[in-house]
Amino acid sequence: MATKFPKFSQALAQDPTTRRLWFGIATAHDFESHDGMTEERLYQKIFASHFGQLAIIFLWTSGNLFHVAWQGNFEQWVQDPLHIRPIAHAIWDPHFGQAAVEAFTRGGASGPVNISTSGVYQWWYTIGIRTNQELYVGSIFLLVLAGLFLFAGWLHLQPSFQPALSWFKNAESRLNHHLAGLFGVSSLAWTGHLVHVAIPESRGQHVGWDNFLTVLPHPAGLTPFFTGNWAAYAENPDSLSQLFGTGEGSGTAILTFLGGFHPQTQSLWLTDMAHHHLAIAVVFILAGHMYRTIFGIGHSMREILEAQTPPSGRLGAGHKGLYDTVNNSLHFQLGLALASVGTICSLVAQHMYSLPPYAFLAQDFTTQASLYTHHQYIAGFIMCGAFAHGAIFFVRDYDPEANRGNVLARVLDHKEAIISHLSWVSLFLGFHTLGLYVHNDVVQAFGTPEKQILIEPVFAQWIQAAHGKTVYGFDFLLSSATSAPSLAGQSLWLPGWLQGINSDTNSLFLTIGPGDFLVHHAIALGLHTTTLILVKGALDARGSKLMPDKKDFGYSFPCDGPGRGGTCDISAWDAFYLAVFWMLNTIGWVTFYFHWKHLGIWQGNVNQFNESSTYLMGWLRDYLWLNSSQLINGYNPFGMNSLSVWAWMFLFGHLIYATGFMFLISWRGYWQELIETLAWAHERTPLANLVRWRDKPVALSIVQARLVGLTHFSVGYVLTYAAFLIASTSGKFG
């Protein structure tokens, strides 16, 4: 007899209902819960799966390169990056009529195509790629790499190639290798690519496999390096009149500190970026030699942590016990990693537009808006995941004895103070911000806009002035030509930086006013409320006054039956579930703010944002409604245009989002009755009743239905805004 799915759980495999399928899928990756799982086997399976993950990423990036080389217009775009729209790939759709074929035939293509808004064209151009041939080579290389990684994943599941548990628990060696190898050497390699390939290409000198050993990246070669005259590599940088990709106005410097942006491409100087990556490489390669391994020199992580004890003795045991707690909990490690990566992802969103690293990215407005929105949403999901795994750590891995009196135990002991302070901050921000907005709406509605409460963000303006922004007239630090920092930086990076920060055409330190002050505090409300829900979920995951034995019920439970009132909605999973709604809400405000503010900057008129962003109707009418006008006319009784696919996707996103409520608002009894009725009808319908199944159909559990609802809500929400963002931006700027 064939073994039933899931093989990893005998109990589930023998379940006579459809619960077998849904719970099987839900727990397929929860390796800890599988039959016969040992700690060593757990680590080995996760380690092997990392290779599969990387293989998928390489396959995906290979596909991007391949489709652009095959169906894109990269070589044409390179000739005129500002006026030719980059093509992602062709569209073949039997539904297209002649009007659609004409509307979607763009960018010099011979048939319908999708326009790229991911920034890959700008990235490839900046790093020195110029031909389709090079894109194909990159694609094939990544495809081979994906195959190698799949093989490596399989290999590390074979008994003789499975690392031992002690190898996974060797924190110092792993830290050294990740610091020196992953960050250090890869940054050094990237510096090498920029210096040897990208910078020469930006000056009109092609470097390929045929000449890379003979073309010197710098006229003096390695002589300045070995003689200690490193400043030679910064001398004679590209001039302000340099034409990117040509020798006109080019210099010979390879590692500079110019500051600001290349006037033509509006991106950071390539030579500045090479210098940055070299510095990162040096720092991280040094850091990767700091921790003690078999050689007996360097720091011991355990000793560092155990030395961190508060001096007076009245603040507990400090960091004692943390080494083993972190090292023995995969959920703790994953929580830390997700928190870091989520924060970095949000920083990427902020820096991609304010300090654009890729040539001509700053002039491709739809791509800038897409990259910002994409990275902020990804960051939100990742950071929610950090708290989810933090909560699972508290439920499954936390040992009160091993952490007695240390900082972790003290956080749990003080959870009421932590949660109530977050609650107070959220309430304060919410009522005051909403109060200001609503007051402004009322006086607008009653015809006295001069009675609005408009608060200038003076502290933020003062900080901007300290960094060199002169428009506010503070005359302080870098905005004062006679201050010590201004005088110290004159010969280095300061002239370029000051020109950048005071330009009206880029997004470096935007000029801010009362509308910014209000939306900043609205976003602060969202961030603090999301954090409140997540922190409360994690700190109450083991138990609370209401339910002291909560940890015995696991990470996600619906409630403890009808006999124990008030135990619904208090599992750590429920906190994650609720927090995701707040996270989406907050990032909605963040992306609305970014987009509306930038539409004004890109169109050369910031008055609409400044005047309408101080009251709620301004946001609804002058941002959302006004910018959806082109979108909802993508197709109408008079025909269609190239925004029609986004108009349709806008509707489809709403549909997915709305479907979520069907799962969120109804509980399992309703579905069970419906399923039984459908099964009854199925059994009595000719032809249909030839199809039989053994499992008795049962409704999803409450927790599963919430997950399905949350997924629909999230996907629909993001998809709806994606369509709005791309259509409203590309509709204005082409």
UniProtKB/Swiss-Prot annotation:
It catalyses: reduced [plastocyanin] + hnu + oxidized [2Fe-2S]-[ferredoxin] = oxidized [plastocyanin] + reduced [2Fe-2S]-[ferredoxin]. Its main location: plastid. The PsaA/B heterodimer binds the P700 chlorophyll special pair and subsequent electron acceptors. PSI consists of a core antenna complex that captures photons, and an electron transfer chain that converts photonic excitation into a charge separation. The eukaryotic PSI reaction center is composed of at least 11 subunits. Phylloquinone binds at W671. Keywords: 4Fe-4S, Chlorophyll, Chloroplast, Chromophore, Electron transport, Iron, Iron-sulfur, Magnesium, Membrane, Metal-binding, Oxidoreductase, Photosynthesis, Photosystem I, Plastid, Thylakoid, Transmembrane, Transmembrane helix, Transport. It comes from Chlorella vulgaris (Green alga). The chain crosses the membrane at residues 46-69, 135-158, 175-199, 273-291, 330-353, 369-395, 417-439, 517-535, 575-596, 643-665, 707-727. This is Photosystem I P700 chlorophyll a apoprotein A2.
